[in-house]
């Protein structure tokens, strides 16, 4: 394997031969392939945070959040999970922006989520998003008792 390449690089959803549903005309399907870490570490030391959202034109002063829901479903007869995201309205704080901060620019506005999902390199994480949505995710790692770190990544559409 070339240096810098992950074990997950180059995988496709078809490699898993599971009947994941096709996205509807109003959806995009994102697929996340995770690198193997070892069964015990995956179970105890790693978690995945899904960060759905949408790029919106917003000012640089206020804090914005997207409303919505993440629903977990399973493939009948297989037990493989997949997720359907619904995005609703955006809300923000009401501070008065001044100067350059008042300029509206395209920025990713994340849905407020609190769930962490099991890290399992044997199965892809399949997420169906609205067409105008975007999915990012974080891999959380335990460093020691009571502390951890996270690395954010943009998910791949398939």
From Swiss-Prot:
InterPro entries: Ecotin_sf, Prot_inh_ecotin, Prot_inh_ecotin_gammaproteobac. It comes from the Eukaryota. GO terms for molecular function: serine-type endopeptidase inhibitor activity. GO terms for biological process: symbiont-mediated suppression of host complement activation. Transmembrane segments: none annotated. PANTHER family: ECOTIN (PTHR35890:SF3), PTHR35890. Belongs to the protease inhibitor I11 (ecotin) family. This is Ecotin-like protein 2.
